[in-house]
Amino acid sequence: MTDLSQHTPMMQQYFKLKHQHPDQLMFYRMGDFYELFYEDAKKAAKLLDITLTARGQSGGKAIPMAGIPFHSAEGYLAKLVKLGESVAICEQIGDPATSKGPVERQVVRIITPGTVSDEALLDERRDNLLAAILGDERLFGLAVLDITSGRFSVQEIKGWETLLAELERLNPAELLIPDDWPQGLPAEKRRGVRRRAPWDFDRDSAHKSLCQQFGTQDLKGFGCQNLTLAIGAAGCLLAYAKETQRTALPHLRSLRHDRLDDTVILDGASRRNLELDINLSGGRENTLQSVVDRCQTAMASRLMSRWLNRPLRDRAVLEARQESIACLLERYRFENLQPQLKEIGDLERILARIGLRNARPRDLARLRDALAALPDLQNAMTELEAPHLQALATTIGTYPELAELLAKAIIDNPPAVIRDGGVIKTGYDAELDELQALSENAGQFLMDLEAREKARTGLPNLKVGYNRIHGYFIELPRVQAEQAPADYIRRQTLKGAERFITPELKAFEDKALSAQSRALAREKALYEELLERLIGHLAPLQDSASALAELDVLANLAERALNLDLNRPRFVEHTCLHIEQGRHPVVEQVLETPFVANDLALDADTRMLVITGPNMGGKSTYMRQTALIVLLAHIGSFVPAARCELSLVDRIFTRIGSSDDLAGGRSTFMVEMSETANILHNATDKSLVLMDEVGRGTSTFDGLSLAWAAAEDLARTRAFTLFATHYFELTVLPESQPAVANVHLNATEHNERIVFLHHVLPGPASQSYGLAVAQLAGVPTPVIQRAREHLKRLETTSLPHEMPSQQSGKPASPMQSDLFASLPHPVIDELSRINPDDISPRQALDLLYAWKMRV
């Protein structure tokens, strides 16, 4: 810390506070501005595009300074938070009029990306999460907190791979890790990673602080007593939240134990490829959520996003949701609920801000309106006979006393902040009414005084006025000032006038100004009392908000089922996936032509479909729609199919499309192989696997070998697999693997032009139509003509020079010995001695890389 004796008293105060918050930008309140100094000022000037100036000198050097008006701070804070910065808000808490030396200041709040609660700093349709991890290479404890809702969960996870996939699903704004962990760990590649002292993760201290927070003797009631690593992480989160909020956290009431085994697991690649709530460009258009989410409230949209990203395997829960949707569809009952739900607003986040004691007047007005809408909503729910809907109705309840309290207390359209008053209704508090009357009647008193003084003095140019610096005054032009009565006391001299005060005006000033400040203080005290009364009802109100969000999602899914022609899927015990007339829910909405629906049948006898057909023929769409139908079924939704019957799945894997991972130093092919390896290691006989064009990122023979081996391994695993390929050699797989079948997407060629029919038919495709697709894409005609010449030559000589020709329109022989027989290389001898059935996919991959180094 710098030698404070060299600096001014105010800068000494600044350095002491800044020393306590070295990692945050310090917003230091000075009058109507937040000022930043030294390195903070330089950084803020660059990030916020504000002017960097200098303020005098301290310690013999000019002080770099940048400032922003306090009333427009929100916009600047939002920008800093989006950039991943944290800000310490330092306010004046002393009275400048009575302070000896610098006004007393203290940090009242720390705003970080993971702990923001202000409405203006949040995306209303996305959760804003804070996470912490503790553990080693084998087992990790993960804790997750949403301070804007009060949701607090823990789980224990095996291995980095599973942990990173879970972090990708959660996408926390901040991630806390122990400071004694080695540098360069995989988790540190994520945004918002902050290292915390190891003792913040102490498990005994964490257990004690969590029990204290929840008012319990132990954590057994939450089912996480033995999750010691996760409890250590949760303790760190709780301490961090208290440190940043500088207040109690009454809205954090419980801890939930999440279990991966309860969910359908999707890795990061699968989530990206299926474009659940973010498309491949990073936007939200044309995603699954953009089609199925028409929720009335923001809190329901956030719940919908959580459902989509964390499908369930609990059949009882899923069927209860289905039953609720069916009930809401009967006689279009959802239409009676949705207008009422729209009145509820974002109750979840409003209640969190009340718990944090930073709720604004408009939050209380929205809560008032929400509570007023509950009785009508309850009446609309009385006819809903589905058990789950009845349980939600019971949880929602009504709060007539709170509704009446807020209706009496808060004006219809309150200001944004309590700072200047004008929030509490007249008639709510007699003392406030009296003080406000004194202040409001000042105008009439001054008019009466001016008229009386004009009459008494005979001076027609006399005026009575007020300004914030000098208070009330009587003003006379300079030429008439000498005629002022003896009881006029000179207060201020202006260029062309003199200002006076009288004992009567001074007495009124003392009373009026005192009344104004006392009225504001009284109003703020009443507002704080309101918050305290609401905090006393926080637990049932939060339960109601959760139930209302779920009701909104279910009503939304009923509306979507009606308007998107979705039907109820049926879960069965025996292993199968049967879809009749399935459709892609997103593609269907953006097409200008009717979508071609297709069937799919996988069961105990058929576990894999090898899908062939032309590029643009619809293979990827067919695969993705299958995954989306299965996923929608596993959130309890109806699905885009005429009929769907399925068993529960444990994972959904997709290997569809790849691009270079430049940041990670991985080529497209390496990304593809990493995704393939993940699938081969983790798929089970209850998984759904989509494999699109495996092996296309390398040479023909390498790619074919890998695709073949991967398909065989998945066939042995008996995972439900859709395997799209342009390697026609793979269409002979059903001969050696009885659980494999061929299907193809059909097309036809007319006058050298291709027409895609998009129907899925049994059997392999007859040709690939590659040149026709190239022509359709606009490849120049001379290039297409030259390509046809090359194709004719290759069809007679094959690859690379001397391979036997094949009949046009028939698949090449799939036997690898034939394909490689003409290549004079030692690797072929080794390959001929290997039985593919005796080696694992991993061994095949290692051999392939070794051979490639030698070729």
UniProtKB/Swiss-Prot annotation:
GO terms for biological process: mismatch repair. It comes from the Bacteria. This protein is involved in the repair of mismatches in DNA. It is possible that it carries out the mismatch recognition step. This protein has a weak ATPase activity. Keywords: ATP-binding, DNA damage, DNA repair, DNA-binding, Nucleotide-binding. The lineage of its organism: Bacteria, Pseudomonadati, Pseudomonadota, Gammaproteobacteria, Pseudomonadales. ATP binds at residues 613-620. Belongs to the DNA mismatch repair MutS family. This is DNA mismatch repair protein MutS.
